[in-house]
Amino acid sequence: MIKFIAAMCAGLALISSLAHADDAAVRVERISVDSPALAGNPEGNSARRDVIVVLPPSYASSPARRYPVVYALHGYGITPEKWFAMDKQDQIAARAFRNGVREMILVFPDTYTRHHGSMYSTSATTGDWEAFITRDLVGYIDAHYRTIANRASRGLMGHSMGGYGTVRLGMKYPGTYSSLYAMSACCLAAREITPEQGRQIEAVKTMEQASAAPFMVRTTLTAAAAWSPNPNKPPFYVDLPYEGGQLRPHVLAEWAANAPLAMLPQYVNHLRQYQAIAIDVGNRDSLVDDDRALHEALDRFGIANTFEVYDGDHGSGVVSRFETKVLPFFSRHLQF
């Protein structure tokens, strides 16, 4: 539970651009993508999703050239706009390209929900976020940008909840991506809920109360919306792990079935199809043991991967490593 809380700390395009006169600069486009996979979800999350696209320096000047694509998944409680405001991914990408990283397109989809995060899961309550990312978004980007439209030229990465999404989607959709990079992936192991935590969660009756609730309560509702949905049970449309003070083991079993450490043995053959898999985590991150366990599980099944523990906490290495580790990783492993 402590680890979880610490970790959780294609359609019409409407384009607005930030263009630079300097040919060495990247171009940022803000678009909207309509997702049939998300339409009509009971939670009320919009099926029109904001997406930030970073185009490499030569994109405008080389109209015949096509590029590989890296899809970048954000963490819990933020959007791509907030991620850009904090970390300046466009500036990071521009520096990386100047320093020899091969040019690629970067795509940052918004998966923020009423409970602050989609968990990149398929849910009868929140919508089919797996299909949005792997089908609707990829299809839109391939149709509207000069991509190299095959799995060998697609990568997937993410941090925290986005790291979880990278592992989850990577396991299930090897036909879409060829390389994976998970940064400080959260939620890899099955969750547990104490009776006291169960009482706190049961006390929340409205969305307004949920928004003002302690972090643990909010993240638990996020997990329930993703992994134990119940579209016939308003206002949250979820099954909770405690009801009337009694533990409901089947709900925890549903959550455990969505934990990558439990899922991995089912997807060994899928994971063996990847060109490259990388995992990193800070030595002061509460997730370090679970991320190491993922690396060790991959090793046990003979799935090639690289694993690095660096000096840092949950968020301290994201900016520097996106430039010096993540983008060079895809530069080496994607097909250009």
For the regions a language model picked out, list residue spans one by one.
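Non-catalytic cap/lid and distal C-terminal segments of serine-dependent acyl enzymes
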Residues: 20-336
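Bacterial N-terminal signal peptides
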Residues: 6-16
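Positively charged n-region of N-terminal signal peptides that target proteins for export
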Residues: 1-4
